């Protein structure tokens, strides 16, 4: 199982989510109305603003601002990380389908044999989303964070 720290300071996961949510387009709007780089829905944005004590100046249009969108999105990923013990599969499923759906899936023995491990995601779109995010995350980790081989200095006279 791939896990993540509770603070979601993992740029690889954030990049994987942004890539699959908006293809790095800060002005993206989904067919359901989600906005910005991390495709945050209106109700979720309002809820996050309240949790961050920023509801007074918050408007849905602020989610087109990359800094605000990433701050809100990474806060939400951190929340999901704490809620789902850093399990990236459950975090990605929760980000895409909602944490309540993940909770319901975990309670169904067809999806989880132990009530903790999400072995089956019953909706195609969320299952595919999770697979794509986890694959991108692993690629980013290998490409950007894996130790690079060091080159031995050439011997003199060689």
Where are these regions (language model features)?
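Catalytic glycan-binding domains that act on GlcNAc-containing polysaccharides
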Residues: 1-158
